[in-house]
Amino acid sequence: MKNRIPLNALRAFEASARYLNFTKAGLELHVSQAAVSQHVRTLEAILGVNLFKRLPRGLQLTEEGLHLLPMINEAFSIMGSALERFHEGKIREVITVAVVGTFAVGWLLPRLSGFTKSYPWIDIRVITHNNVINLAAEGIDAAIRFGHGFWQSTENYKLFSAPHTVLCPPNVAKKLTTPEDMKDYRLLRTYRKEEWSSWFKAANLKPWPVTGPIFDSSRHMDDAAKICGDIALAPYKMFIHEIENGSLVKPFDIEVHLGGYWLTILKSRSNIELNNALNIFKTWLLNASHSI
């Protein structure tokens, strides 16, 4: 079609099709009923078909109008989505970050509002994982993991260490005078087998069997400890809120260092210039984590 179709004519048709009334369409578009009618007639003339039947009590879409309407709606939706990507002259950017669940709830999410305030044109899509993630296969821009930084396919940036200590609800803590008193309680654990043995050694205790359930997340494990009156060994920096409000207690000052939290980015991406949003997030995260 050689003739350019005026955008106002398409807007007038779409609004009129929703209301089946030129007057109501005009109120939405802030133009007169006559202007809407003229825009629709212009579109009909360009297309060479009638889009409405003009009836005494309103409008009715013709077969051609019914066929055209969903295509117009889709076109407006595409334009709207494209325009939403801009914020105050900047194109919106989206990055996907896979975050180990304990870190997401205990540290990252409470601070993301500050990032969004500073960089409102960047959307962070957070997905959680249990420390097993394939960045390339899952289309992830970056991941935050727990460990020692020995991942081969990624560039690894340490955020901070995550010392583990005993956490339990206050009613249990009251009954723990010495570490040996924990023998009377169920000890919860994650999939890392060395956790409790390392803590027993740090506490100068002869190990005893740990038979509590195994969790894939320290967050879930500590929730279970609060509900069931059990004892957990967890990265206490991720539970500062619970410690401050008294729902969890550190009965002993004995800590073990089992690893830390790391930002990881595929080497294949690090070898080329990172996109602007990912580079901004990386810089913000490193600065924020190193300040604690």
UniProtKB/Swiss-Prot annotation:
Record key words, sorted: Activator, DNA-binding, Transcription, Transcription regulation
UniProt-recorded Gene Ontology molecular function terms: DNA-binding transcription factor activity; sequence-specific DNA binding
Portion annotated as DNA-binding: 22-41
InterPro entries: LysR_subst-bd (IPR005119), Tscrpt_reg_HTH_LysR (IPR000847), WH-like_DNA-bd_sf (IPR036388), WH_DNA-bd_sf (IPR036390)
GO biological process, one term: DNA-templated transcription
Residues covered by the HTH lysR-type domain: 5-62
Main function: This protein is a positive regulator of gene expression of carbapenem-hydrolyzing beta-lactamase (smeA). Seems to also be a repressor of its own transcription.
Family: Belongs to the LysR transcriptional regulatory family.
Protein's name according to its UniProt entry: Carbapenem-hydrolyzing beta-lactamase transcriptional activator
Source organism (scientific name): Serratia marcescens
